[in-house]
Amino acid sequence: HLMRIVWHGGEPLLYPNKLRDTMPSLLEIAERRGIPLETQVVTNGVMATADILEFLSGYNLGRLQITLDGPPEVHDSRRYRRGTKAGSFAEIHSNMLAALNQGFVQRIDVRVNLDIQNQGKLERLFAILAADGVQDNIHLSLGIITNTLPNESCSGGANNYFDVYGFSEDQAVEEYLKVAALAKSYGFQPPGELIVGPWCVARHPHAWTVGPDGEIYKCLSTVGRPEHVVGHLPEVPSNDAVTSYTLRRIADCLDQGCNMVPICGGGCLFEEKVNGTTNCPKALLQRVNAGLLTLEHGQ
């Protein structure tokens, strides 16, 4: 058994004192139940300073994920400060190196979101990181952006972004494998496999996403959407409905003889909601993973 706390956002490090207030209580709960505690942080990296990471390392900081969507000229055009429009690459890069050099983490997951905006523009990112000599300390997470639900409170929302900059399946496969090969050419270990479903919070019977006001969601992608709230702390709702549906989906996949079930888990429940149809990523998984196997082991 393991009690895993993943600080996610929005930006989870925006109010570091909230973490400082909460972590001792979470550790106390874990110790009272005799189970280890692991802490993870998924952050944009701007506020991943040595001060807060040193604090979190005292709570078994097992994973730090930051996002770099390209070299400075690309990343800073997408991820800049709200008021000044100043870029964030340099700050994130500095925080990454400090985290590794000071031993707060042994490895950093670098998330790179792939879309038409940064297509063919990622080589200098790998060149910069390779010059730092951190190839053995970087785990690459390549993300193919997907559609989402409209949000009336946010003009020009993420669903509109996908309509303009999202890839078709053929484009996604081609770009994913190109970027993986490019990373390998600079000494980084490319992703070993593309997985969807099995590691998702929505699939796990003892995993939940908790919002800032104690609201509980089953899917991370539904946070902030009141219609998807399934409960409120301290009461934890039943997970039976999701588990039952997941098992039925997996049974259907197995009946069809699909060999992707272990890395698919029946597909993404959120994408089913977005697209109004059963989500079956079989073709995408087969094509990308075949390419990754070839990249790793040759023909």
What are these regions (language model features)?
Residues P12-V74, R81-S94, V112-R124, I145-N147:
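Canonical radical SAM enzyme core domain
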Residues H1-M3, G34-T39, N60-G62, F104-I108, ...:
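Short, well-ordered coil/turn segments that N-cap beta-strands
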Residues E73, S77-P205, T209-D213:
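Radical SAM enzyme [4Fe-4S]-AdoMet core and its adjacent flexible, acidic
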Residues H1-P12:
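Active-site groove signature of glycoside hydrolases
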Residues S221-Q299:
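Flexible mid-to-C-terminal extensions adjoining Fe-S/redox cofactors in radical SAM and related proteins
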Residues I5-W7, V41, I66, V110, ...:
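Buried hydrophobic side chains on well-structured beta-strands
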